Amino acid sequence: TVQELRHVSQFHRRDDLRMHAYSALDLAVGVLNEFMIVEKTLYDPSQGWGNPLSYSGISPLDPTVKWSISLIDESGKVPISSIQEKDLVSFFAIMRADGSFVDEDDGQPFFDSMMDWQDADEDERDEGAEDDFYEDLDSPYFTPGRKIENFEEFRMIKGFAFDEDDPRESGIFYNENGSETIHMKNFRDCFSFFHEGPVNINTAPAYLIKFFCG
């Protein structure tokens, strides 16, 4: 029947789209490998690898399909696992000030909460939060006692999401509506969970460069 044909065809279409997605991925990897072979390094998208489709001149054989490839260069970000305490405290203090006078002490609560979230003990830092704090929430949960694995995890950590009971000392990453703030965007742009080497200053965001320059 026509309905049966429609039902079967939707899965064929899904498989076709998956094939096109993998083709675009192979193309992007191929372009990056070519630049690595020829130039030995990837230091800036302006080398030509930033737009694999334009560089390769290849398009889908199916005219009804359009490819779009977006590359995010993680090398221009700071490895989140290696930044020093004083730098991260200062980073949070600048965000907390939101353009007004910066008090370095204002960044400490966010750093302490972040560290307590990751460590395996129950010893609460001076301005941090351990399981006792999270167990008293309306929807209680526990700290994982491991490294933070993604940016969404900050929604769960004291101070980063908006807290109606403590509006002045919370919400630097998520506002009262649960939406990301400009500080969360800047944090995403500046820090990486994947990159582990030195920061590539050629692709570092303006916010990070400004922070480094004081």
Spans of model-derived segments:
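Compositionally biased linear targeting/interaction segments
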Residues: 1-214
